[in-house]
Every structure is written in C-alpha cells, then in structure tokens.
Amino acid sequence: IMVRNYMFRLVQLFALEKEDRLAELLDYLDEVPDFGAILDDYFDEYDDIDSGPEARGPEFFRLGDTDSRAWSVRQIIKDPDGDHAYQFVATVDLDASDEAGEVRLSDLRVEY
C-alpha cells in the first residue's frame, strides 16, 4: 500500500503542476526527470489530469515481480482522452526503503 500511495502522490503533485515539490521529493535520486518540460509536453496534448478516485484505481497501477528486493512499478496517468500515454515508471529499492523508513526509488522516468 505504501508503494501505491507513493506513486499516486507523484500523480497528484504532477496534476497540481508542483514540479519543484516533485524534484524535492526525489532529490535523493541520481537523475530526476525534468518535470517542467514533461508538464509542458503533457499540457500541450491535454487540458487536465484526473487525480480523482478512479485515477487511483488498480487499472492505473502495475506492480512487477516482487520476488527480489527491487520492485518495478508503473503508475499510469489518467488523461481526459483515455490515451494513458503518460506513465511514471520506477524501481522501488526495498533495502533503501527499509533504511529510510519510507518508500525509496532507485530510478524514475516518465514515459510518453
């Protein structure tokens, strides 16, 4: 549940156009996506981001293999056209998460 909440928090901040807060939240990563540029691209295509209850549904979240200490996750952004082209794709580092006491990613990218 923590991982799912964390990934959806990224969607919420993205929907609110809080690129500085996103960068701050992820400042421990070696490479942080250029959220300003990604937001510009998104809003060139779409007028809005759905961050309501339906956007939080299981059809917009994917958890890969959980047999290792690194989990692949995908959070799909629910756009008004139903394209679902924009997606947060990350690897959750369980060892770093245990040490930090909160979800820690080893990488994050935005696919579109």
Regions from the language model: what does each represent?
Residues 85-112:
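Short beta-strand edge/turn micro-motifs at domain boundaries
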Residues 1-16:
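Short, low-complexity N-terminal intrinsically disordered segments enriched in polar/charged residues
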Residues 39-87, 93:
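Surface-exposed, charged secondary-structure patches
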Residues 1-5, 29-50:
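Long amphipathic alpha-helical scaffold segments
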Residues 11-15, 28, 79:
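Generic alpha-helical structural element
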Residues 26, 79, 95-97:
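Acidic surface patches and DE-rich sequence motifs
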Residues 16, 60-62, 102:
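Long, compositionally biased intrinsically disordered terminal regions
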Residues 16-30:
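Short, well-ordered alpha-helical segments enriched in acidic and aromatic residues
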